[in-house]
Amino acid sequence: MDTKFDDVLTGEQKLRNFNINFGPQHPAAHGVLRLVLELDGEVVERCDPHIGLLHRGTEKLMESRTYLQNLPYFDRLDYVAPMNQEHAWCLAIERLTGVAVPRRASLIRVLYSEIGRVLNHLLNVTTQAMDVGALTPPLWGFEEREKLMVFYERASGARLHAAYFRPGGVHQDLTPRLIEDIEEWAEHFPKVLDDLDELLTENRIFKQRNVDIGIISEKDILDWGFSGVMVRGSGFAWDLRRSQPYECYDEFDFQIPVGKNGDCYDRYLCRMEEMRQSTRIIQQCLAKLRVEKGDVLARGKLTPPPRGEMKTSMEALIHHFKLYTEGFHVPAGEVYAAVEAPKGEFGVYLVADGTNRPYRAKIRAPGFLHLQAIDYIAKGHLLADVSAIIGTLDVVFGEIDR
């Protein structure tokens, strides 16, 4: 007898896997992340990320805008630390045009790149703690982020979408008062990190949720193309600020924190230590900025003339008008410029055809490659561990979907 009620008669149940949607409206899903999870009981069998919910066609839009008009698009990629993305775009243009950035502008860029790193890691470490049940860290972390956002605003006029780094330098100089305030913040900040450390690092619950979860080996790093903390947490001391120094990073004294086990906990420890190292770089930057005065924009075809000059010189006025209507022309060629963004290696592959618009710009977002591997990393873990793994991948959908 072969009927559909056989299993009822024998008492044997046919087990089937359970499919659930994780996100896009889930408290632990970062932004518009959607995962389709296949569960066997509470064990993850398959984890399928669905991307594209924040796709805006950035790379295509960039082909119809001038180089300067494209700059603000980079703020909208990884919107947690916007200036780090602008940096890659400016470096790409400067390499093709052969423009040398003034010394003071270079120092300001390093300063704000490191402030961006602290902004990013503060958000990541504290929200990762919240994902696994600790509610205090986000409140403390956001208090510090607020101070840094104010520094962004005082430099560029905007808290988030700064458009402060420009091809040839930075938009405007920092005031002496702002430099003093950043210095004061940098003195007090390590105390905040110590408080966070005390709450989380040896916390039994936090360790149970993160130790030996989402382990990544050397082979995985090379297979999936990881970068940033995902690499350093597994014991590779790979940091573009050291291995391929750009701007003036080779002048600074800082260390690169490296993990041992490549699990969520080691990546958390790396991010905490990176914030301390960033604070060191910030303090060294400020000391140099006090001494080294000068221009913050390379005067030439890429940058506008000084205001005063425009009131007396017709040529300066014409240059200003042409720069903001037609934009500058970049010589034909191709270049790949990468920076060590907080999430990993953020790169721009720029192809120029000699006009005032890029022929093609390919954006290499680190988070995209990290999210690709979520199925591989999460397989065999429990459902509750998925949110810990996502927290430690550090994904932001502005740059993944772009």
From Swiss-Prot:
<keyword id="KW-0520">NAD</keyword>
<keyword id="KW-0874">Quinone</keyword>
<protein>
    <recommendedName>
        <fullName>NADH-quinone oxidoreductase subunit D</fullName>
        <ecNumber>7.1.1.-</ecNumber>
    </recommendedName>
</protein>
<comment type="function">
    <text>NDH-1 shuttles electrons from NADH, via FMN and iron-sulfur (Fe-S) centers, to quinones in the respiratory chain. The immediate electron acceptor for the enzyme in this species is believed to be ubiquinone. Couples the redox reaction to proton translocation (for every two electrons transferred, four hydrogen ions are translocated across the cytoplasmic membrane), and thus conserves the redox energy in a proton gradient.</text>
</comment>
<keyword id="KW-0997">Cell inner membrane</keyword>
<dbReference type="InterPro" id="IPR022885">
    <property type="entry name" value="NDH1_su_D/H"/>
</dbReference>
<dbReference type="GO" id="GO:0048038">
    <property type="term" value="F:quinone binding"/>
</dbReference>
<dbReference type="GO" id="GO:0051287">
    <property type="term" value="F:NAD binding"/>
</dbReference>
<dbReference type="GO" id="GO:0050136">
    <property type="term" value="F:NADH:ubiquinone reductase (non-electrogenic) activity"/>
</dbReference>
<keyword id="KW-0472">Membrane</keyword>
<dbReference type="Pfam" id="PF00346">
    <property type="entry name" value="Complex1_49kDa"/>
</dbReference>
<comment type="similarity">
    <text>Belongs to the complex I 49 kDa subunit family.</text>
</comment>
<dbReference type="InterPro" id="IPR014029">
    <property type="entry name" value="NADH_UbQ_OxRdtase_49kDa_CS"/>
</dbReference>
<dbReference type="InterPro" id="IPR001135">
    <property type="entry name" value="NADH_Q_OxRdtase_suD"/>
</dbReference>
<keyword id="KW-1003">Cell membrane</keyword>
<dbReference type="InterPro" id="IPR029014">
    <property type="entry name" value="NiFe-Hase_large"/>
</dbReference>
<keyword id="KW-0830">Ubiquinone</keyword>
<comment type="subunit">
    <text>NDH-1 is composed of 14 different subunits. Subunits NuoB, C, D, E, F, and G constitute the peripheral sector of the complex.</text>
</comment>
<keyword id="KW-1278">Translocase</keyword>
<dbReference type="GO" id="GO:0005886">
    <property type="term" value="C:plasma membrane"/>
</dbReference>
<keyword id="KW-0813">Transport</keyword>
